Amino acid sequence: MLTLKIFVYTVVTFFVSLFIFGFLSNDPGRNPNQR
């Protein structure tokens, strides 16, 4: 049970980090002329 909970938390954290990283990477990617 504890292992399953740790696995779930790891997957959730991984997806959240991926979403945040992708959002931050795409933000300046849409405006390459600003910088």
UniProtKB/Swiss-Prot annotation:
UniProt cross-references to InterPro entries, sorted A to Z: PSII_PsbI (IPR003686), PSII_PsbI_sf (IPR037271)
Localization (cell): Plastid, Chloroplast thylakoid membrane
UniProt topology in membrane: Single-pass membrane protein
Keyword annotations from UniProtKB, A to Z: Chloroplast, Membrane, Photosynthesis, Photosystem II, Plastid, Reaction center, Thylakoid, Transmembrane, Transmembrane helix
Pfam families membership: PsbI (PF02532)
Gene Ontology BP annotations: photosynthesis
Chief place where the protein resides: plastid
GO annotation, cellular component aspect: chloroplast thylakoid membrane; photosystem II reaction center
Residue ranges of the TM segments: 4-24
Domain of life: Eukaryota
Physiological role: One of the components of the core complex of photosystem II (PSII), required for its stability and/or assembly. PSII is a light-driven water:plastoquinone oxidoreductase that uses light energy to abstract electrons from H(2)O, generating O(2) and a proton gradient subsequently used for ATP formation. It consists of a core antenna complex that captures photons, and an electron transfer chain that converts photonic excitation into a charge separation.
PANTHER family linked: PHOTOSYSTEM II REACTION CENTER PROTEIN I
Family that this chain belongs to: Belongs to the PsbI family.
Subunit description: PSII is composed of 1 copy each of membrane proteins PsbA, PsbB, PsbC, PsbD, PsbE, PsbF, PsbH, PsbI, PsbJ, PsbK, PsbL, PsbM, PsbT, PsbX, PsbY, PsbZ, Psb30/Ycf12, at least 3 peripheral proteins of the oxygen-evolving complex and a large number of cofactors. It forms dimeric complexes.
Protein name in UniProt: Photosystem II reaction center protein I
Gene name linked to the record: psbI
